[in-house]
Amino acid sequence: MDEHIDEICSDIEYQVKNGIATMPLFSMTLVPEGDPAIDKAELLTKSYEKFKARLDALGIPSGALIQASIGHGGKLNADSAFQKYIGFNDGTQRAVCCPLDEGFRQYIRKSAERIAKAAPAHIMLDDDFRLMARPQRGCACPLHMAKFNELCGTDLTREELYEAICKDDALGKKYREAFIKVEIDSLVGCAKEIRAGIDSVDPTIPGSFCLCGKSAEGAFEIASIMAGAKNPVTVRVNNSNYCAPSPRFFAHVMHRAASQIAALRGKPDYILAETDTCPHNRYSTSAAMLHAHFTFSILEGAAGAKHWLTRTASYEPASGKAYRKKLQKNLGFYEELSRITPRLTWLGCKIPIPKEPVYVLTPEDNLKVGDGWYAHVLDRFGLPMHFSPSGEGAVFLDSAQDKCFTDEELLEFLSGKVVLDGAAAEGFIERGFGKYLGVDVRRRDPSEPNASGELIYPSGSCLAQPDVRELTPLSESTEKYTDVYHLRDGVYRDVMFPGVTSYKNELGGTVVVFAGSSSFEYGWRTAFGMLNETRKKNLIKILTDLGTLPIYYPEDGEILMKAAKTEDGGLLCAILNMGLDVLDELPLIIKRDVKSIRRLCPDGSYEPLKFEKEDELYTVKSPLGVFDPLILIID
């Protein structure tokens, strides 16, 4: 890109002066190639120094992004002599260097030293610096296996270790903890070499780290090393939204941010979101998606972002104009939202975040990472939901999520208000908590009469839930919201068993059980036993009975909503229209007397909005655009 240095530096100057960006980082792909390894740092830093000189003259600080250190795994032009990553679960070799290899450590240390000699204002280590957050679930090369066997006093092969961990018995758990420790320690040791290279030139240069994976895989330790002595610790979380084919499932980026921020336990000084538009044009990511992504990342706890707004594969400046315009317009919006978010108390449907990070090493571990309620149902219905280890509201669990929590934590859930889908209820029963659910759960045989539909009380019917199980009440106190029926002869509805039940247990809690699964493929045969207005009314009644529904959108638009108490007793409501229909006005059911409704504006100010009231229905006289986040303050 050197031939476009004038245009690029002018663009950077515009971004910094207009609050679009604070500091540009120049990408350096250092994953070694060749034997001996090519000195990529020398080649790339020479180019960076040309840009840095121009930016220094403009008074603009700049830094370096070590975009690849051990490698993201893509095909290389030439192999290096360093030990390669060997997949833990499949034994395959990847185009990734093992961070235990002493030769590689010296290579990356010298590379960091060369970058530091250019006097960057910041050095960020990118998220290829990971081992378990890959499809192969860790490095089991000879170096890593030797470290593991030394730690445990064993002589296991990769295959034997993987088999033991998959069993998940006492020995398997011991080996799991040791394996995780060895993987993280190898990264931490390598990060120390990178920092040593920087410190050998200038120990005051600040650094940061980009983590990858919900488990946060040693992120705070690595970020603390990269920061350098007496510098703030900064971590970029891994909540990218590359090439999203649809606004649907946007909740995944929220959940990833929330999970990683929880795993970091408040330790870093700064947390940045990954609002990367990769591959950096609007055929991949719209400016609206970028704005929504940044907005909801702030609501999950990010204090800024590592943006990537510029095409780097080729010089295509027009591809970033809409991104810059959107971010510049909303600078005040982001700053005000960042100011008020830390003092919010979240309300509504609570997706609990485990207190201990969940490392996905085996196929069984994948089942723990449920996304049913938050990414298939609640995110479409305009019912407030939040991801949190704390906060208020009814706890929603699906799949095998119970395995992420201790017995004590499950009892705490059961002592409050909890909603389980059929798979989650099975997990609670297997753990010995069946008596608190009020029902037994049985998987049905395919030869049994099919579940044609569901009667929703007090009136209405719809398709049966996906993957429905049979619920059998265990107490006269078990109440039912629905019944599953078999349609006989195309006319007769033969009721078979309850579809949704509620039970007040001896712990003082109320447990709602759905017979089906909240996780399903999005298709007309699978999704619409859940995604319909009758089911939405069913959920509204349940949440109203539980007393956990302070506000909601009552109609059939695809609305994602978050709600929270403000520190002065007001109500914040964050709304995202995920459908393709602009709403001319916004109806809301609000369970409180409302004096005013204000909108957070792009410049950070608040605009009063007009509304009409009819009982609990408040109709806000303001349009809601497609994928345009709306932040309301309701007093």
At which residue positions do the language-model features occur?
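A structural motif corresponding to the C-terminal end of an alpha-helix
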Residues: 18-19, 51-62, 114-121, 189-207, ...
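Active-site-adjacent "subsite" loops/lids of carbohydrate-active enzymes
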Residues: 61-119, 127, 131-135, 148, ...
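Catalytic domains of carbohydrate-active enzymes, especially glycoside hydrolases
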Residues: 5-32, 114-122, 233-234, 292-304, ...
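Hydrophobic targeting/anchoring helices
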Residues: 26-29, 132-135, 197-373, 449-468, ...
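Aromatic-lined carbohydrate-binding/catalytic grooves of carbohydrate-active enzymes
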Residues: 7-47, 70-92, 132-135, 139
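The substrate-binding groove and active-site-proximal loops of carbohydrate-active enzymes
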Residues: 1-3, 29-45, 90-109, 171-189, ...
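A conserved amphipathic helix/loop scaffold
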Residues: 369-370, 375-376, 380, 387-390, ...
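Conserved, mostly hydrophobic/aromatic
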Residues: 108, 115, 123, 198, ...
